[in-house]
Amino acid sequence: MCRADWSTSLSRSAAIILALLIAGCGFQMQGALRTPPEMARTFIDVDDRNSLFARELHAQLQRADVDIVDTATAATARLSITYEETDQRVLSVSARNVPTEYEVYYTIQYAIDAGERRILESQTLTVTRNYTYDSTLVLGKAREEELLRDAIVEDLVRIVLKQIATL
C-alpha cells in the first residue's frame, strides 16, 4: 500500500514539474483563431479566387467564424492579396546536366485594411520545399510536387492566420 502511494506521488510530482517546465518555456496550446472585431465581415481581394492559397485562406477564415463577403462595400475589413506566385526551380543537376533536385516555392504579398485604416501593413511571405527528381519516377514525382505545394499553402495560411491573431 505504501509502495502504491509513493508511485502515485512520484507520478503526480513528475507531471507537475513537466507542466511547469513547458509553461516556463513559453509553450501554449493552440486554441481557436482570434480575429480582430474589424474582421467580422471580411472581403478577400484577390485576382484568382480559385488559387490554392485563396481557397485555403477562405476555408480557414470561415472555420474561424469570419463571415467572408462577396463585395468590399459589405465588408468591415479587406484582406488584399496583391501578389501571388508559385513555381519550381532547379536546385541541382547531374553530371549529364539532368535536374536531380527541385525547389517548389509559393510567394504571397498581402495587407489588411479596416475601413480607411490599415491594420496590417503589406507583408511578403515565401515558403519553399525541396525534392529530389528521378526521371524514372515521373508520375510519382509530379504527385510529390503537388503534395508539397498543398503543404506549402497550408503553411502560408497558418502564418497569415497567426499574424491576424496578433492584431
Name these PLM-found stretches.
Residues 61-65, 112-116, 135, 159-167:
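Sec/Tat-exported extracytoplasmic proteins
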Residues 21-24:
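C-terminal motif of bacterial Sec signal peptides marking the signal peptidase cleavage site
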Residues 50, 54, 101-105, 145-154:
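Solvent-exposed, acidic/flexible segments
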Residues 37-85:
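N-terminal segment of the mature soluble domain
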Residues 26-29:
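Bacterial signal peptide processing site
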Residues 139-167:
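C-terminal/domain-edge helix-coil "capping" segments
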